[in-house]
Each structure stands twice: as structure tokens, then as C-alpha cells.
Amino acid sequence: MAVIIGSARHDEHGNCYSGGKAGDQTGQEVSTQNFYNHSKGWYVLRAKDDRVAEKLAEAMQIACGNKNIGYDQSERYGVIKHGINTKVKTECDCSSLVRACIIYASGKDVGDFNTSNERPVILKSGLFDDMGSYHAGFILRN
């Protein structure tokens, strides 16, 4: 069984900054794919509460399946304002999508972050354990 991950990648033009139309125009702006080894590696942060872990997975599936959520860094807070179940066409970027999923799963807003400070901000919330860097043989989920 493959491990599936979800993420916000780029807008309908293949850009990562701004200028896209709200909502997912291509079905690939915010979507799921098989887990892969990223060139920069992965840090694994595991929810301390199994219920939160399950809700995180549910949240990402909901967000990735919601065609009202697209990608635009300059409009990244739309998903925080409207939530992952939004009926309003809105935007996110990779870090604001993670934040919105944490809010859905835990009921707690861990605060604003971007990919450069994501790990320490999320860990400061007390909701997650730092499992370190992903490596071959690492168990992602028991």
C-alpha cells in the first residue's frame, strides 16, 4: 500500500508566487500524490494524539479534494479565513495549507509560519513530536 501525501504546489500557470485565479483551476494546484523522496529531505513531525493524527489526514484529503482551494502565495491566508471545507474560491500556499489542516484537526491555531520556520513553530504548539529526518526504513505511520 502506497503512502499518499497532500500538498499545495503551484498555481494554474506553474508559478509559486502570485497572479493565479482563486480556486484550483487544474486539479493539480492542491492535490495528493504518492510519497516520494524529496531532494531536500523530509522532517517528520508526528501528532502526539492519535485522533489529531487521523483528523490531520482527513483534513488534507478534504483540502486536496476541494476545488475551491487553489495556490497563490500572495493570497495564502484565504484558506485560514475560509477553512478547508470552504465553498468560497480561495487560495493557500504549502505552509498555510498545513496550518489550516492543523486548525481543523486540533481546533488550535499554532500561529503563522512559512516553510523556513514551519518546524519550530509547529513544535512549539506542543501538539507534535519531532521524529527527525525521514530515512529509508522509517515508519511513517504505525
Task: Cite the ranges covered by each PLM segment.
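Activation targets extended, charge/polar-rich intrinsically disordered C-terminal tails
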Residues: 96-142
